[in-house]
Amino acid sequence: MTYPETLNWLFNQLPMYQLQGASAYKKDLTNVHLLMDYLGHPESQLQCIHVAGTNGKGSSSHMLASVLQEAGYQVGLYTSPHLKDFRERIKINGVLIPEDFVCDFVNQHQAFFEANDMSFFEMSVGLAFDYFAKEKIDIAIIEVGMGGRLDATNIITPLVSVITNIGLDHTQFLGNTLAAIAAEKAGIIKSNIPVVIGEYTSETQPVFLATAKANHSPVYFASDVIATTFPSDLIGDYQIHNKKTV
């Protein structure tokens, strides 16, 4: 398939949330684990920072990638959604994944994807992890797509987990209270792995503390940090919180 044909096929695998509603939301990570087994576990070859949150996770992910790149690391960045080109989701040091790699990945594995009903998101994550592993990057910044606990990215064991903030988003899938949504996003907290919390409320802080305690994970609150001001192309007062988190 050509690149446009490959994209057309990929986008046809998008979950039809608008038509199916909550039933289109996969309830576990079985498919992703199956995919990683099939690909030879590229995720286990990566050093990662995992970023979740309602708002600010994209900006924070890009800032983290920029800081680490300036420090001399080869940095993979996986984010979603894209603005113009699907390849914006997967970058190394700011350079988009090549069209040929996308086409070859899909063409090589299409039969497996179809046989196992892989979703667009699962295939995108598999593509990113496979690309980063083959390019032998130093570190990957992985942004959660939706929620956290059941997101396709939540198969990594990161160096640190980051949760920027909690708002009422995707309530049909994640719950209709801040505490319920916080619990879903706190699902990225791993055993003995530190977690940084960008912002919290009286409803969400107990959730973060309880989840971190259950996982024996050190927890750090960005609000406790007196951040040194540094220049950024990202404008808006809310970016101050993102800078503190980073």
Residue ranges: model-predicted function:
Residues 7, 32, 61, 102, ...:
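A general structural signal for well-ordered alpha-helical segments in protein cores
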Residues 22-29, 33-46, 70-156, 174, ...:
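ATP-dependent carboxylate-amine ligase catalytic core
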Residues 64, 128, 208:
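Aromatic/hydrophobic pocket-lining residues that form π-stacking "cages" and hydrophobic walls in ligand
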Residues 2, 7-26, 86, 142-146, ...:
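N-terminal-biased segments
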Residues 46, 118, 136-143, 158-245:
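Acidic, Mg2+-coordinating active-site environments of NTP-dependent enzymes
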Residues 1-53, 60, 66, 70-71:
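Short functional linear segments
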